[in-house]
A protein has these predicted regions:
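Long, charge-rich, low-complexity alpha-helical segments
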Residues: 4-5, 12-105, 109
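Short acidic/polar alpha-helix capping motifs at helix-coil junctions
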Residues: 6-8, 234
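Active-site histidine-anchored catalytic micro-motif
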Residues: 93-233
């Protein structure tokens, strides 16, 4: 930007201000702020990056305080703010439609028309709404943008047209999983076409059976698109 190399910070928690950019020369210095480096170590790193001929201990402390205020350090302040964001989401009974109006229409009529157009484009979907085969036991569907994956979506969910399964288990890709291998949620998922309720009893049974492989919270679902896209078709 304007001849300067910058790092643009993207924070899924939403703590770092949108559009926050960091001078690329400060990257190695930021990496050294691990609690083990001394002020002298950080001054030497500063000089190696040619940020300045010399930085006082006050300069380093001011810089570190700025990083901390921006939530770029794994500090008590960051952990407190992170825990509040996670707890606030955990307290919700619903998981809002994160991508409505961004990746697909937020208006029910426009979304229904788009889904019908996608489903009618696949061989499995060319019917009058009657089942074209037995109820599938499992489906493999994409979790990409609807327009980019329309053919694969049509082939997958066209096979469900005319069927009304009693229960659907949706296993989505977790792009932002932290702790655990799986993240379960009992939240209701509102969509422009209606609300999709979770089987809370079944979710709790899975949670108990999963033990330590299940994440202690469901925060990974907040901005995750892989399940949100499936629910539009379901």
């Amino acid at each position: 930007h304007e001849g300067r190399e910058l790092f643009l910070v993207r924070d899924p928690l939403g703590l770092v201000a949108e559009g926050y950019a960091l001078d690329a020369r400060l990257g190695p210095l930021l990496a050294r702020l691990d609690g083990a480096a001394t002020i002298n170590d950080l001054q030497a790193e500063w000089m190696r990056q040619d940020c300045s001929a010399l930085a006082s201990s006050e300069d380093i402390q001011t810089l570190a305080a700025g990083f901390d205020a921006a939530f770029l350090l794994d500090s008590p302040a960051f952990r407190q703010a992170r825990d509040k964001v996670v707890a606030d989401f955990a307290a919700r009974s619903t998981r809002p439609a994160f991508l409505a109006g961004k990746a697909y229409p937020a208006q029910p009529g426009a979304l229904a028309a788009l889904l019908d157009e996608i489903l009618d484009g696949g061989e499995e979907g060319r019917s009058s709404g009657q089942p074209v085969g037995p109820l599938p036991r499992a489906l493999v569907a994409p979790h990409i943008d609807l327009a980019a994956g329309r053919e694969a979506y049509a082939r997958a969910y066209g096979a469900l047209r005319g069927h009304k399964p009693r229960r659907v288990v949706v296993l989505g890709v977790g792009h932002g999983l932290g702790n655990g291998l799986f993240s379960l949620t009992a939240k209701t998922f509102p969509t422009p076409l209606g609300r999709t309720a979770s089987d809370t009893a079944a979710v709790e049974r899975l949670r108990q059976a999963g033990g330590q492989v299940v994440a202690p919270d469901d925060f990974a679902h907040r901005g995750e698109h892989s399940i949100e896209f499936q629910l539009l078709f379901l």
